[in-house]
Amino acid sequence: MYSKFQNKFLTADNKKRAFIETEKLKTLWFNTGTLCNLACKGCYIESNPKNDRLAYLSFNEFKSFVNESIQNEMGTEKIGFTGGEPFMNKDIFKMIKYSLDNGFKTLVLTNAMKPMLNNKNDLFRLNHLNLTIRVSIDHYLKEKHEQIRGPNSWAPMIEGLKWLSKNNFNYCLATRLMWNEDETTTRENFKTFIRDNELKINADSKIQLVTFAEMDEKSDTPEITTECWKILNKNQSEVMCSSSRMIVKKKENDYPSVIACTLLPYNSEFDLGNTLKESLKKIYLNHPHCSKFCVLGGSSCG
């Protein structure tokens, strides 16, 4: 017998661990660096103003992976930027432009605060049908949002949202299901927030208001076996790593790495090499996030 999530190939009760096979990389995620203007409680990637564990990705590093995908016809449709706070990376606008110029749907995750607002002119010039800005908001009430994100984090976020709306950007919201409130209730309460702030968001849309299952590596969650797909009536293709990868630049490394999952940037088991081609290998679901967030939670970062 093993402890849970210890053996790559077998679960604690000695059953074959579920795995994912990848054929196309529909979504390429780029972590622009872990530095952030906020230090949110429970940040899965531990971003804050001092954490540079993932260094800033340069434009040339980004470009090499995009070109690899294009040249090898890997089926990429969307490019996503996450952090940290992407707008703190000086090359972010060059990266967004290159993504759009090559015809990719482009998604930027942001807190919509000063790093974005201080660069409004640069962002405005890139406004495009294929560009979507996803703004993180941890609650529809200021008090609870600031419990997670810290004091004075609400008003700048609202300012950023209203600027995006006024300037006709494609934008959406992302929130966490962490308040002992079911998703239906959360969406109903967000309708009031959206109406009060005159935003162009449909709270019933799972695309315009994205809800994420809460992640806690220490909480107990079942391991996923090869038998679970049939039991749960789920398909491997529904799991994020079946069609996506994330590129990160670890501070101690000379070259960026390709990671299986946006949620596991520091776990060496999910580091798949330095090229997209190398990364096309089986991904064994050997982490609590694989179970709770992706398979049972049905969440996806894209």
Q: What residues fall within each predicted segment?
A:
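Conserved hydrophobic residues forming the short capping helix/wall of the S-adenosyl-L-methionine
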Residues: 69, 124, 194, 198
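A short small-residue
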Residues: 46, 139-141, 171
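Canonical radical SAM enzyme core domain
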Residues: 50-64, 86-129, 133, 137-156, ...
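Conserved alpha-helical substructure of the radical SAM core
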Residues: 2-83, 87-105
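Generic structural signal for hydrophobic
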Residues: 69, 99, 126, 161-164
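Accessory C-terminal segments flanking Radical SAM cores
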Residues: 213-302
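Conserved C-terminal portion of the radical SAM core fold
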Residues: 75-80, 106-107, 130-137, 155-221
